[in-house]
Amino acid sequence: MYNTQVAMDNQEKQYIEDFKTYLTVEKNFSEHTLAAYASDIVSFILWLDNMSCTKADFDKLREYLHFIQRFDYKKTTIARKIASIRTFYKFLYRERYIDSNPAISLSAPKRPKSLPKFLTPEEVEQILNNV
């Protein structure tokens, strides 16, 4: 998926640690959500290879989204990965690590809407007879 031999520089490691603190203290994320978001960001930064996460622009983020959509992820997983990236860049912008937020227009894939399940007339009658 990505080159795991490429090491993140110390600054990016610090961004991730600060981001995890932000998610814990200010967003009150659960440990599970925190771990998922951190993993998503590490994967993204490793995918960037030698480019700093602070230099990525909207086109680079879209390129990453096209990359992850080639895998057999559920739409909910892709939506979470996008949410992770959007939250990360919002954090970087808020902390003034970047001058503009390239993820502000990034949108998640639409989740399919399903129709509600309904009772058959026989099931309704059976319920009414048992009351």
For each predicted feature, which ranges?
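N-terminal core-binding DNA-recognition domain of tyrosine recombinases/integrases
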Residues: 2-6, 17-32, 38-115, 130
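A detector for short, charged/polar N-terminal pre-domain segments
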Residues: 8-14
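Two-component histidine phosphotransfer core
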Residues: 118-119
